[in-house]
């Protein structure tokens, strides 16, 4: 039963969303990382309203790494959880400069070391930037996967849903 459902869902997405892409606007892996961090608990549409100014002010990790919390906060204060996100963005950029030669790392293990980057964000970066098979499980994927029976009731966390979907 599940295999048939997986095949039907896969067929539908192949036919209707062959090139599914993020709706976040970005022009580099670094800028996508900023946008995905900002998108937590916020709509992509809202994030896209603020990222052009952010990307112009912080074209490289070193620019953001040397910014003050207050400057970043002022630029993102209308996005959800600006205090945490401002701290995470500056810390993320500092770690990129210090530990990764100002490059966005390509592995899940490295990505989740960055402040503000959890599995979902890391999986988006893996998929979009590095074209790797990755499953970014947000609240919508979690809910719909349960609702249509793609996962079992024992999948009670986003990680469990991610692992189950990737396995099948």
Language model feature labels by segment:
Residues 1-168:
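Catalytic cores of DNA base-excision repair glycosylases
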């Amino acid at each position: 039963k599940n295999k048939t459902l997986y095949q039907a869902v896969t067929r539908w997405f192949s036919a209707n969303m062959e090139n599914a892409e993020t709706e976040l606007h970005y022009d580099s892996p670094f800028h996508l990382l900023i946008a995905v961090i900002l998108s937590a608990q916020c709509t992509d549409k809202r994030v896209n309203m603020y990222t052009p100014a952010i990307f112009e002010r912080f074209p490289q990790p070193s620019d953001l790494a040397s910014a003050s919390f207050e400057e970043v906060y002022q630029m993102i204060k209308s996005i959800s959880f600006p205090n945490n996100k401002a701290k995470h963005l500056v810390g993320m950029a500092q770690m990129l400069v210090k530990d990764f030669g100002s490059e966005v790392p390509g592995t899940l293990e490295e990505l989740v070391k960055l402040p503000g980057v959890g599995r979902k964000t890391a999986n988006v970066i893996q998929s979009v930037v590095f074209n790797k098979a990755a499953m970014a499980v947000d609240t919508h994927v979690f809910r719909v996967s349960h609702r249509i029976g793609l996962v079992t009731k024992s999948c009670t966390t986003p990680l469990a849903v991610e692992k189950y979907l990737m396995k099948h």
